[in-house]
Amino acid sequence: MSKATEMAKVSAKGGFHLLWGLVASTVISSVGTIILAGLLSSGDLGLYAIALAAPNLIANFRDWGINTAIVKYSAQYRSENNIAKIRSVFVAGFAFEIILGLALSLLSLFLSGFLATTFYNRPAITQLIQIASFFILTGALVSTATAAFTGMEKMHLNSIMLIIQSAFKTGLIIGLVLLGLGTLGAIDGFILAVLTAGIVGVLLVFTMYREFPNPSHIKLELMQTIKTMIKYGLPLSIGTILAGFLAYFYSFVMAFFVTDNSLIGSYSVSTNFVVLITFFATPVTTMLFPAFSKLDFAKEGELLKNVFQFSVKYSALIVVPVTFLVMALAHPGIFILFGSKYPEAPLFLVLQSVAYLFTAIGSLSAGNLINGQGFTKYNLMLTILTVAVGFPLSFVMVFQFGIIGLIVATSTVGVPSLLFALRFIKKNFGVSIDWHSSIKILFSSGLSGLLTYFSLSLLPSSSLLQLFTQLIFGVIIFAISFVLISIITRTINKTDLTNIRQIAKGFGPLSKLLNIFVNLIEILMKIFRV
């Protein structure tokens, strides 16, 4: 097995563990959200969201890129077997996040009256904002633990923490609301759940920390480590803050120019359905960063090139077909849950999904490679470019085309930055994406999506049973079409199957199912003489 394949195996294993954690925690949280919406009035539910908004905004200034630096340096030092520096990274990272988190929580607590009265014009929510302010500190524990798990590629521990947070949040919020505490109980339950998850995360990180050797002659270099981490991570933190302001601007121009609330409702529904794609995209993005951080281009240039091309091709083989499948099934999927209440939502979902097709040209890999190799200042420049394009583009597009204009703007605003990133990677690392593979993946997935869509259009869809039938047949038609087209067009070849077999070994019991699938593809290849 090549080192690139071995790294892909480790990353795939981590991604799989993150996937089941994301799915389970999202399902639990969704159930809780639905129940909470039934227990609280629409007004109280709105106050719950408003009270959490201000601390969430202030929390953006807590990180300073430290968590990203924890991932980067723990992965790098782990590959170098430099345990002493990993210890310093963990201790320095937690110390910084806790101190700054506490300071910002106190600041939010102090400003709660001003925020409630002047900013939100709702003096009655002062107490809610005061309690919600502690999310800045408790959230610091969770996010720092997540960074430590990611850098050490222990994503099963992260999934345990996520599920505990979702379960406690759902149970505590519902329980306290049922006790008659209303919005106050919902806020209390949320904070207690995040605190519980944070404590669990810290304890799990401590178990990893205790396993490290502890030579008595080596001291923790906390101040030097913090300086190094801030120097690396601060540009990324600035970029995150700028991107956050851009997201707020999107919401502002939508509310300002789109006067039809039903269109905004349909947009909200379609946004929730995009989560189906992010279930697959997020684990890929998360695990690529530590993978690139472990490589030194000066010493392992050829390996880095292979890993980059691997990452683009195999992330595209996962995300792009899922994206086209979601597009093809947008109508039955949304109408099963909501009927005809949100008629524009399927179209909005199709348009929002387009952004994930850029996975085929490296949208999930390029930034991770640049950050993993330490070029965070350049990544900040890319973010500034995106923001500079995003403000005027979204304003013009929403003014002219409403929600559709917003979706087009948000889906394409990152393209210039992506092209510059690919140019930077080509110039500095001498590697480009495999354009032939990317085009084949897009073609095979797109054609499968079209076949699925037109096949379903021939079926009746007037009843709930018929919609379920469409959904089931749609998945079957897409899966068969994609496999056959991929074989005929050589989108997947025998080398890919060998690599997939090796990577699948990281999936434990599921590897047997994947091997059965790979064996089936091999049989079909022989039939088609590919």
Walk through the language-model features, giving the residues of each.
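Interfacial segments at transmembrane-helix termini and the short loops linking adjacent helices
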Residues: S112-A132, N261, V326-F358, L465
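Transmembrane alpha-helical segments of multi-pass transport proteins
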Residues: T386, H436-N499, G506-F507, K526-V530
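N-terminal membrane topogenesis motif
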Residues: M1-S29, I83-A92, H217-G239, A345, ...
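Hydrophobic alpha-helical transmembrane segments
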Residues: T126, Q130, I160-R210, T271, ...
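Helix-loop junctions and terminal segments of transmembrane helices
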Residues: W64-E80, T150-G151, R210-N214, S270-V319, ...
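Signature of the first transmembrane helix
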Residues: V10-K72, F96, G101-L109, F135-I136, ...
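Transmembrane helical elements of multi-pass membrane transporters/channels
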Residues: K13-S30, Q165, G189-A197, G201, ...
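Interhelical loop/hinge segments that connect adjacent transmembrane helices in multipass membrane
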Residues: M1-S11, T183, V202-A247, M287, ...
